[in-house]
C-alpha cells in the first residue's frame, strides 16, 4: 500500500489543500493520502492557531466522503513537540507494510537541512515537493542536488535516492487560497464557502464562538 502523509497546521483546511492531496494521490497512484494536522504549539503563544482538536475535526469534515483521503492523529496525539522525522517513524510503526510518501511545499526545500534528523527523512519515506505551476523547476532541481548530491534523475521531475527512495516534484497547483485568507475573510463576517469545503464552512459557523477566541 502506498500512503501519502500531508502535514501542516491546517488553520483551517481549505480547498487548495484538497486539490494538492487529490493531485498527489492521482499523479503518483497512491492508495491513500492522510492529512496530519500539527499538534498544539509548545512553549509559545497559541496566537491565531485553533486548538489541535478543532483543526482535526475540520479536516475530518473536509475529507469525509472523499475517496482516498483521510486524516491521522499522529501529531496531535503525540506527547510533546513533534518533528517530521518523528512523525514518519511513528507512521512506519503504524503502517509497517506501507510505502510512505512525505508531501511538503516546495519552499520547504530552502530550510530542509535545518530540520531535526533531516538526513533520515528520505530513508523513511519518498519525498514529494509540490509547487505552483509557474515555479522554476530548474532551480528546484539544483537545490535538490545541493541537498542530496547522490541523487540521480530517473525521469521528468523524479530523482532516485541512494537508498532506493525517490523525490518527486509536482508543480501544477494553483495556490490562490491560503489559510490566512480564510481567517481574514471569516473575521470580516464574509462567506467562506467558496474557499473551504461545504462541511468545513458549516462546522465553522456552528463553532463560531470557539473560533472567535482565536481569530479576533
UniProtKB/Swiss-Prot annotation:
Keywords assigned by UniProt, alphabetized: ATP-binding, NAD, Nucleotide-binding, Nucleotidyltransferase, Pyridine nucleotide biosynthesis, Transferase
The protein's Enzyme Commission number: 2.7.7.18
EC primary class: transferase
Pfam families: CTP_transf_like
GO terms of biological process kind: NAD biosynthetic process
GO terms for MF: ATP binding; nicotinate-nucleotide adenylyltransferase activity
Pathway(s): Cofactor biosynthesis; NAD(+) biosynthesis; deamido-NAD(+) from nicotinate D-ribonucleotide: step 1/1
Coiled coil (residue ranges): none
Catalytic activity: nicotinate beta-D-ribonucleotide + ATP + H(+) = deamido-NAD(+) + diphosphate
CDD domains: NMNAT (cd02165)
Domain of life where this protein originates: Bacteria
InterPro entries according to UniProt: Cyt_trans-like, NadD/NMNAT, Rossmann-like_a/b/a_fold
Signal peptide extent: none
PANTHER family cross-referenced by the UniProt entry: NICOTINATE-NUCLEOTIDE ADENYLYLTRANSFERASE-RELATED (PTHR39321), PHOSPHOPANTETHEINE ADENYLYLTRANSFERASE (PTHR39321:SF3)
Free-text function comment from the UniProt entry: Catalyzes the reversible adenylation of nicotinate mononucleotide (NaMN) to nicotinic acid adenine dinucleotide (NaAD).
HAMAP family (alphabetical): NaMN_adenylyltr
Family: Belongs to the NadD family.
The protein's name: Probable nicotinate-nucleotide adenylyltransferase
Origin species: Maridesulfovibrio salexigens (strain ATCC 14822 / DSM 2638 / NCIMB 8403 / VKM B-1763)
